[in-house]
């Protein structure tokens, strides 16, 4: 089964002495690695800038999701920003799929999931002002997925720390909307949540 087709996955941050490049493992419910999320295109100078200041968050960033055999499935590219963020999403071959666009700069975080023609496919939003949990809603506002740090019944509780979370996406979600949902949910800590800091 492709990583993109899974209805449940667990995202676990790889331990680093100094976090200069984000990299997360994607695991199944048995704790087997099924993919990885990796920040790409960072020069040594960019890594140093990230370590010594917060200016790095305003520069262009690229993240990619790979499956277990190293095949690139999704790429997220965030052009340089000041306030609201916009992520351009493409498939592993570089073909545009759509975008993830931040709606607000105050209050609970909310991102629109848009198709390639700009059509509204769904929403990715925080459940409240202080919760880390997020909901995925379809175009009609119906919940079809969730990102949470609260889960039960897994065989990998030993891995649970503040930087781990569970992604659940309904099997009915398909096409570009599913790719955008997986991209936003799987990358919430590496891209969207960290990017929502600073002036946002």
Tell what function each PLM region has.
Residues 1-62, 66-73, 78-86, 92-97, ...:
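Low-complexity or membrane-interfacial segments used for flexible interactions
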């Amino acid at each position: 089964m492709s990583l993109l087709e899974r209805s449940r996955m667990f995202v676990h941050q790889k331990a680093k002495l100094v976090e200069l490049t984000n990299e997360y493992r994607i695991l199944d419910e048995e704790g087997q690695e099924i993919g990885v999320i990796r920040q790409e295109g960072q020069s040594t100078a960019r890594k140093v800038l990230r370590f010594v200041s917060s200016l790095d968050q305003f520069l262009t960033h690229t993240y990619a999701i790979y499956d277990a055999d190293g095949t690139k499935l999704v790429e997220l590219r965030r052009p340089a920003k000041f306030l609201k963020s916009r992520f351009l999403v493409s498939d592993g071959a570089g073909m545009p799929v759509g975008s993830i666009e931040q709606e607000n700069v105050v209050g609970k975080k909310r991102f629109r999931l848009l198709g390639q023609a700009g059509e509204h496919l769904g929403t990715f939003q925080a459940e409240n002002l202080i919760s880390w949990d997020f909901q995925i809603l379809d175009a009609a506002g119906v919940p079809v997925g969730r990102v949470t740090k609260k889960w039960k019944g897994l065989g990998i509780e030993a891995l649970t720390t503040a930087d781990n979370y569970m992604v659940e996406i309904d099997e009915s979600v398909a096409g570009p909307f599913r790719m955008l949902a997986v991209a936003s949910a799987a990358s919430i800590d590496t891209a969207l949540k960290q990017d929502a800091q600073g002036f946002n």
